[in-house]
Amino acid sequence: MTISHVLLKASTAIPSKDKLHPVLKDHIPIFEQMAKAAEDRHGLVTADLFGHEDWADSLCDVIEEHGASHPQFTSGVYSFPFLKPEYINDLLNEISAMSFEVNPEEDALVQIPEITLADNCRTLHDCLHSLFQYAVKPLAAILYNLEPKFMQSIQFAQYTPENTAEGHWHHDEDSDITLVVALTNNHVGGGTMVKPQGLGEVFMVPQLPVGHAMLFQGSRTLHYGLPVTEGARNLLVFWSTLRP
């Protein structure tokens, strides 16, 4: 039986808008408008931005597209500032008081030491789930025409030279929409290689700034984490699905 983690700081597990990155927070009302329009119109197209300068401005101000020479919002792989650095520090303090374990049910090639919050700290899991629903769900509607209603896992993961000597291509079988948040950036190596669908060329998503998140369709996008050669790469990973 897993003993639940006792929080070092109670407010770390209270969902509040002040935990979001300031660059993102002010644009969420616009993204909610866009998500509603995407639902009503069965998806948005570039032409929808022409009559809504604020829509285009918000997307370009917040979302970085990877695998495209200029912003088209079609590659399916994006990054954006999600959580503010001060809150990341609170999360790292909690991590320091917990223990990482590998998931024996995963393929040995992709096993990474992790802390699954549903098992180890349900209150923190629920807080982060609320922040995901508030900030990321509208982006999923805009960028993928999808609604990730169900959270399959929220976990801290740690990549080190000992456990990532080489990467392995894989899909996130239990995640339609995957979000990976950088908790640290003082290691050497890391980043993520991505193979887009169809005949697209492989590209790299570099190590992101602390608090920034990579967003992609985990179950449909081949990817692997590049080796960490020095230090530890700490991540916060969300796996969400359209169905239970």
Task: For each feature predicted by the language model, list its residue ranges.
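Non-heme Fe(II)/2-oxoglutarate
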Residues: 51-146
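Catalytic core of non-heme Fe(II) oxygenases with the double-stranded beta-helix
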Residues: 141-244
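Short low-complexity stretches enriched in small and charged residues
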Residues: 32-39, 45-46, 71, 106-112, ...
